[in-house]
């Protein structure tokens, strides 16, 4: 009996390792395909760019706002430094505005807030150096809900809020607009409201409609 238990435990561990390896490879392949795709798409003058991770990628922004000038440059799994490596197109294009949300994947892989914010500042400075006239909007990172989270989150809403406060303070130094989404998505327990998410991290259609209501005034002014 003991040998059967040990065999079963080993089988579960090996299966989990292979599953994790599969999803890691799948995410890496998806990432490289998206980067390759974006590198072959011209950014037209006056475009409005949404850039970030899967939360950005999963929205059809141009349809949401009925605006063909909006383009999506989100990639699932991306981190701050990943976005920094993807913005070379700003050197040779003239988009009107850029909406940025990034950082939750850094937090969920265990990066400390100080390190994330240091990379974030370098990213924003790089954006402004490449395109000084661009209208830059810095989204707060959204809250999470640990009760419905897939797996065990490393990030906490307390750490997210602390990073958001740093981003807000920094935005004023960079002539950027800070967009507070965080507080709008909270429930009474100060977690991501379940009506906007089914996994505690990503948002659903209702969530994107709320996001639209918060930023539509900025889109209309561009």
Pin down the residues of each PLM region:
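N-terminal secretory targeting modules
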Residues: 1-49, 57, 61, 220-222
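Acidic/histidine-rich helix-loop elements
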Residues: 22-25, 67-80, 108, 151, ...
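Oxyanion-hole/transition-state-stabilizing segment in secreted/luminal serine hydrolases
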Residues: 50-51, 56-69, 80-118, 126, ...
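Extracellular/periplasmic catalytic domains that process cell-envelope and extracellular macromolecules
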Residues: 41-44, 64-65, 92, 129, ...
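Charged helix-capping and loop-helix junction motifs
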Residues: 113-123, 156-163
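General small-molecule cofactor/ligand-binding pocket signal
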Residues: 71, 137, 177-179
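A short helix->loop->beta-strand "cap" motif at the edges of active sites that frequently abuts
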Residues: 131-135
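Catalytic His-Asp segment of secreted/periplasmic serine-dependent ester chemistry enzymes
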Residues: 20, 143-222
């Amino acid at each position: 009996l003991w040998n059967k238990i040990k065999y079963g435990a080993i089988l579960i561990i090996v299966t989990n390792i292979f599953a994790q390896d599969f999803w890691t490879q799948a995410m890496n392949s998806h990432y490289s395909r998206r980067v390759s795709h974006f590198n072959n798409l011209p950014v037209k003058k006056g475009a409005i760019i949404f850039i970030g991770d899967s939360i950005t990628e999963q929205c059809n922004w141009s349809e949401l706002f009925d605006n063909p000038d909006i383009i999506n440059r989100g990639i699932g799994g991306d981190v701050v430094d990943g976005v920094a490596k993807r913005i070379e197109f700003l050197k040779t294009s003239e988009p009107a505005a850029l909406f940025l949300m990034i950082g939750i994947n850094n937090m969920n892989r265990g990066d400390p807030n100080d390190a994330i914010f240091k990379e974030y500042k370098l990213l924003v400075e790089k954006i402004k150096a490449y395109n000084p006239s661009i209208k830059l909007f810095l989204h707060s990172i959204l809250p999470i809900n640990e009760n419905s989270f897939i797996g065990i989150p490393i990030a906490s809403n307390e750490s997210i809020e602390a990073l958001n406060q740093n981003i807000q303070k920094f935005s004023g130094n960079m002539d950027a607009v800070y967009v507070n989404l965080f507080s709008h998505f909270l429930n009474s327990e100060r977690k991501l409201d379940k009506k906007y998410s089914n996994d505690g991290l990503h948002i659903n259609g209702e969530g994107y409609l709320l996001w639209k209501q918060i930023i539509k005034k900025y889109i209309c002014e561009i």
